[in-house]
Amino acid sequence: MNTVLNNGRNTTCHAHNVVAHDPFSFEHKSLNTIEKEWKEWKRTDHSLYVAPIVGTVGSFLLKKVGSLVGKRILSELQNLIFPSGSIDLMQEILRATEQFINQRLNADTLGRVNAELAGLQANVAEFNRQVDNFLNPNQNPVPLAIIDSVNTLQQLFLSRLPQFQIQGYQLLLLPLFAQAANFNLSFIRGVILNADEWGISAATVRTYRDHLRKFHRDYSNYCINPYQTAFRGLNHRLPDMLEFRTYMFLNVFEYVSIWSLFKYQSLLVSSGANLYASGSGPTQSFTAQNWPFLYSLFQVNSNYVLNGLSGARTTITFPNIGGLPVYHNSTLHFARINYRGGVSSSRIGQANLNQNFNISTLFNPLQTPFIRSWLDSGTDREGVATSTNWQSGAFETTLLRFSIFSARGNSNFFPDYFIRNISGVVGTISNADLARPLHFNEIRDIGTTAVASLVTVHNRKNNIYDTHENGTMIHLAPNDYTGFTVSPIHATQVNNQIRTFISEKYGNQGDSLRFELSNPTARYTLRGNGNSYNLYLRVSSIGSSTIRVTINGRVYTANVNTTTNNDGVLDNGARFSDINIGNVVASANTNVPLDIQVTFNGNPQFELMNIMFVPTNLPPLY
């Protein structure tokens, strides 16, 4: 038997990418460039049944929330989704979903849906034409007032949205429903923002503020419910679960999470929900009951800055003996994930083996972050003489490619996303582990057998100034007066870690920290810009609690109870509200600690869901 230890590192340099990394690259990118990148993604990474328009629309809406320009979002959205009046892109979304979930509309229902798409396009186009006429009275016939057009279109939306909620096809039509809801909520937001220019009364503006609150709530709850029902019914291999989740997050929940931020303006959304990709190695079947553990395993160290991974691998060749075929077998025995500051994860895989590979970015990972992975595995047979059991384990930064084993199969990449963590699973995970999700930053070795599949965690998070001495992120505030968000899971440190968990959310631009013990303190570190902001915390406190916030030596307190006083969205057990903590200053050119302490008044269920620094001159729309 001949054993080959793969101690080398395969690297490929892409010279065209050797540029200084821009922590606000997404904000500086044109919509035309974004559209081209999603089309190229579809052309080269075709394994996922996702129409590229869904990624473009998500990016477009994020840019609009982060901008003060372009109040007429509805007109731009029409040109994106219905170019030249065509419904082809919406039909492409439907066909992709039919392929993905293996369900088709019957002929009559398909006819109804296509008619509704055509009607939606015509209604939006007519409204935009009427607004153009109203704003250009010297060129076109002028309507006496735009309010009639506004109210008419709102009623048309309310009559058309139910046509994408047909009984028996809720999951299949969910991506189309989400796009139709994008139109309706963008329209409502536009009415509020354009009220002065359009001559809309204060009373009508109040009505449409109420509409924005109500329909964000109703549409969000509708999207969450069929997804959760479908996910709970899964009993699949890990790649199937992750693919289903990624598909629905790109097609639906990217939008749902943005809707909750439509009340803000000029707010840079600096991170979002994770997208996951895995290899296809043999593992046990998992159910939704196992998901809380898997979820915790994949992002238990999401607040650290990824630097690479190390472990043990072998490629073994069994020679032709007694007429048996030559057999090549590649095995990843164990892996540890490494972060800046000398921090490493627990071991995934076999124990008591010597490390024989170490992959790192070579350069500062803030300048050359990981962006792409190859994680597939399979078996090749060359007649009856040779059989090869191969694994792929390759990772690409913006500069170089590194391999545990050579890159093969489909790559995992999403435009404007970065690989912010790596994890993995063994062939069989113990029931004891599956029943006990990892707490925040927990170090727990998983498995006693070889790694069956690695998992890469993709996130939009990019505005990282530097790393704290413990290896965690320092969040960079924009240079201008744009507001920004910080994900609660990207903390510098949290005390009471053993009773702090990451909780999955669908309508929140990422996940929450769930505190199960009173008086935890979560610290975040910001690189300030000297600007003053209104600090909002999105929290779910089902029961009474007191929040104490400390920044720049000032202390702010707020008593909260969101049991009934909330936005109306039930997001995986959370009922949230955005709490205005007060006016804070992000001191310039220094690292600013932000401490958030929570005291329970009784026994509430408490989750910290988002941290938002909102420009003081742009209060929320409701």
From Swiss-Prot:
Similarity section: Belongs to the delta endotoxin family.
Name this protein carries in UniProt: Pesticidal crystal protein Cry2Ac
Functional summary from the UniProt entry: Promotes colloidosmotic lysis by binding to the midgut epithelial cells of lepidopteran larvae. Has low activity on dipteran larvae.
Keywords: Sporulation, Toxin, Virulence
More about this protein: Toxic segment of the protein is located in the N-terminus.
Record's keyword annotation contains Kinase: no
GO MF term (any one): signaling receptor binding
Provenance organism: Bacillus thuringiensis
Gene Ontology BP terms: sporulation resulting in formation of a cellular spore; symbiont-mediated killing of host cell
Signal sequence, start to end: none
